[in-house]
From Swiss-Prot:
Job of this protein: Transcriptional repressor of genes that require a bHLH protein for their transcription.
Record's comment describing the protein's domains: Has a particular type of basic domain (presence of a helix-interrupting proline) that binds to the N-box (CACNAG), rather than the canonical E-box (CANNTG).
Protein's recorded name: Transcription factor HES-2
Short sequence motif named WRPW motif, residue ranges: 170-173
Gene Ontology MF term list: DNA-binding transcription factor activity, RNA polymerase II-specific; DNA-binding transcription repressor activity, RNA polymerase II-specific; protein dimerization activity; RNA polymerase II cis-regulatory region sequence-specific DNA binding; sequence-specific double-stranded DNA binding
Principal subcellular localisation of the protein: nucleus
One Pfam family from the record: HLH
InterPro entries per UniProt: bHLH_dom, HES_HEY, HLH_DNA-bd_sf, Orange_dom
Length: 173
């Protein structure tokens, strides 16, 4: 079967493929209904052997009934926004750093405490102002800093990049 040379050939080709496509579509529907029956019967407490002759409509009705009876809390929730994901990742990273940094003794304790205080403050400001952790022109909220954190010195620590709120959020991992 090459490319049709005339309009009549194309029509013939469509005519011959139509039953084949319909057969495949019906096979997919039947396979999906069979899988659905296999999934829904155990959840309803019925045995597969007793219900082998269920009609397609029965399987669909049982599925609809089962889904209607599910509590609303078990329904899947919407995916988090990229901004929320960024904030959660940033906070988790700072929390991990707060556990590791004092133990590895790479920095002096005062510098380490100042760095952690700054990072916690940035995480809190990103949460409070809806994800924009840009310039801190206003007062920031108290940050959950370590208990032994000394007062910050005058040397500023670079701030993390502000979380982008968009579909093209790039992640290094």
């Amino acid at each position: 079967m090459g490319l049709p040379r005339r309009a009549g050939d194309a029509a013939e080709l469509r005519k011959s493929l139509k039953p084949l496509l319909e057969k495949r579509r019906r096979a997919r529907i039947n396979q999906s209904l069979s899988q659905l029956k296999g999934l829904i019967l155990p959840l309803l407490g019925r045995e597969n052997s007793n219900c082998s002759k269920l009609e397609k409509a029965d399987v669909l009705e049982m599925t609809v009934r089962f889904l209607q009876e599910l509590p609303a809390s078990s329904w899947p929730t919407a995916a988090p926004l990229p901004c929320d994901s960024y904030r959660e990742g940033y906070s988790a990273c700072v929390a991990r750093l707060a556990r590791v940094l004092p133990a590895c003794r790479v920095l002096e304790p005062a510098v380490s405490a100042r760095l952690l205080e700054h990072l916690w403050r940035r995480a809190a400001s990103a949460t409070l102002d809806g994800g924009r952790a840009g310039d801190s022109s206003g007062p920031s909220a108290p940050a959950p800093a370590p208990a032994s954190a000394p007062e910050p010195a005058s040397a500023p620590v670079p701030s993390p990049p502000s979380p982008p709120c968009g579909p093209g959020l790039w992640r290094p991992w």
